[in-house]
């Protein structure tokens, strides 16, 4: 298959996250390969936070898709009405109208609060949900950028505490994401982050969301590279055609 055909196929989320896309290693694989190799290859189970995050992304990047998102007018997920709605509509998830309202506010804030951020996201030449494939440490990798704009790879994140974002970025694997994306797209990466909590100003009228722009530093990306390299060493050890150890026979053996 030609490169252009691969990229076009990966634009479809079902292909990207399905069997076709799984022939490529992605950032979501790196944490397992590094810390729990036996989990490599397992699909990440869906959960409500994924659905809410997906809706936030679609409102900003793919508003036409957001119109098709399943939204139900009930008070909560742990209700009989919610479960009946899923069953009646053959769905595995839906978001409530209250959740949809809150996420719409978050998306509007992201798009309109800061003129530089707005210009970056809504640039005339910006590309959204752009896939890429390439080789890293001798193995095929894939990535899908939220936004390509003004010579940057831009990734949208939400967080419960923006003041811990820099520290948590290492824990959540954003450093490895930055390395992989910068390597494959050949351009620097920055994160646009929005807090999930709507807050009231202390000294003036009005409400706000915490919002931040976090360009990636060389140090941050290099640390990500080291983690990816370690992950790929484990891949070669357990899963390559020249594997030297069986993952089924592996136990943790580490001095304290």
Where is each model-derived feature located?
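Flexible, glycine- and charge-enriched loops at secondary-structure boundaries
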Residues: 167-171, 221
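Secondary-structure boundary elements
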Residues: 119-120, 150-153, 183-189
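Metal-dependent nuclease catalytic regions and adjoining charged, substrate-binding loops involved
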Residues: 100, 105, 180-256
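Gly/Ser/Thr-rich active-site loops/lids in small-molecule metabolic enzymes
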Residues: 170-179
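Short acidic, glycine/proline-rich loop/turn micro-motifs
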Residues: 162-168, 210-212
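Conserved catalytic cores of phosphodiester-cleaving nucleases, focusing on short active-site segments
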Residues: 143-165, 181
């Amino acid at each position: 298959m030609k490169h252009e055909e691969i990229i076009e196929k990966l634009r479809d989320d079902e292909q990207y996250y399905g069997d076709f896309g799984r022939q490529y290693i992605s950032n979501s694989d790196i944490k397992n390969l590094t810390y729990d190799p036996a989990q490599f290859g397992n699909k990440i189970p869906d959960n409500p936070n994924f659905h809410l995050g997906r809706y936030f992304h679609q409102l900003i990047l793919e508003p036409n898709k957001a119109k098709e998102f399943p939204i139900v007018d009930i008070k909560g997920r742990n209700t009989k009405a919610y479960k009946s709605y899923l069953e009646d509509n053959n769905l595995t998830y839906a978001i409530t109208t209250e959740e949809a309202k809150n996420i719409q506010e978050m998306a509007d804030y992201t798009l309109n609060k800061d003129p530089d951020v707005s210009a970056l996201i809504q640039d005339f030449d910006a590309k959204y949900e752009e896939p890429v494939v390439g080789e890293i440490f001798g193995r095929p990798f894939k990535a899908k950028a939220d936004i390509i704009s003004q010579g940057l790879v831009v990734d949208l994140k939400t967080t419960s505490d923006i003041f811990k974002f820099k520290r948590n970025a290492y824990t959540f694997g954003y450093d490895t994401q930055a390395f992989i994306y910068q390597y494959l797209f050949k351009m620097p990466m920055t994160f646009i982050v929005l807090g999930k909590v709507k807050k009231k100003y202390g000294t003036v009228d009005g409400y706000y969301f915490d919002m931040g722009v976090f360009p990636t530093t060389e140090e941050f990306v290099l640390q990500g590279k080291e983690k990816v390299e370690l992950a790929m060493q484990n891949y070669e050890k357990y899963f390559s055609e020249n594997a030297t150890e069986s993952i089924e026979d592996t136990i943790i053996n580490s001095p304290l």
